[in-house]
Amino acid sequence: MQFTLSAVVLALAGFSAALPAESMNNGLQHQNGTPRFPVPDSLTIEQAQAKCGDQAQLSCCNKATYAGDTTDINSGILGGTLSNLIGAGSGASGLGLFDQCSKLGAQIPIVIGIPIQDILNQQCKQNIACCANSPSTASGNLVGAALPCVALGSIL
């Protein structure tokens, strides 16, 4: 009798862990691919750099991860128990860090007036961020602290 009860409990636990989680898309990008924190269409690179300040560099980032902003809804008695133990839960990729960033700089206008390359949304279609002037990686330094980037749309 005890063997049967324990076999049933293990089978239910395995079944609930095997069910796929319903993932809520509350991360940086929405399902249609637009950034979570958009910037106004008329914002120029100079205005955006002024918002970032002199201690940060205006950057265009391909990847962003926000831990705690995603929610996995698991159904079942022990749903999600094993996934949280192996590190596959909400925010498993990191905490509010941007990755694969390239610096955006002001270009010299070729035509009189505001050139098309001066509009920020024409330069970067991904995530626009203000990144600290130090590298945002923790590898190879004594302190081991990574200084992340902040989404420009969140501080406007």
Curated annotation (Swiss-Prot):
<comment type="similarity">
    <text>Belongs to the fungal hydrophobin family.</text>
</comment>
<keyword id="KW-0134">Cell wall</keyword>
<keyword id="KW-0964">Secreted</keyword>
<keyword id="KW-1015">Disulfide bond</keyword>
<feature type="disulfide bond">
    <location>
        <begin position="61"/>
        <end position="101"/>
    </location>
</feature>
<dbReference type="GO" id="GO:0009277">
    <property type="term" value="C:fungal-type cell wall"/>
</dbReference>
<feature type="disulfide bond">
    <location>
        <begin position="131"/>
        <end position="149"/>
    </location>
</feature>
<comment type="function">
    <text>Aerial growth, conidiation, and dispersal of filamentous fungi in the environment rely upon a capability of their secreting small amphipathic proteins called hydrophobins (HPBs) with low sequence identity. Class I can self-assemble into an outermost layer of rodlet bundles on aerial cell surfaces, conferring cellular hydrophobicity that supports fungal growth, development and dispersal; whereas Class II form highly ordered films at water-air interfaces through intermolecular interactions but contribute nothing to the rodlet structure.</text>
</comment>
<keyword id="KW-0732">Signal</keyword>
<feature type="disulfide bond">
    <location>
        <begin position="60"/>
        <end position="124"/>
    </location>
</feature>
<dbReference type="Pfam" id="PF01185">
    <property type="entry name" value="Hydrophobin"/>
</dbReference>
<dbReference type="GO" id="GO:0005576">
    <property type="term" value="C:extracellular region"/>
</dbReference>
<dbReference type="GO" id="GO:0005199">
    <property type="term" value="F:structural constituent of cell wall"/>
</dbReference>
<feature type="disulfide bond">
    <location>
        <begin position="52"/>
        <end position="130"/>
    </location>
</feature>
<protein>
    <recommendedName>
        <fullName>Class I hydrophobin B</fullName>
    </recommendedName>
</protein>
<feature type="signal peptide">
    <location>
        <begin position="1"/>
        <end position="18"/>
    </location>
</feature>
<dbReference type="InterPro" id="IPR001338">
    <property type="entry name" value="Hydrophobin"/>
</dbReference>
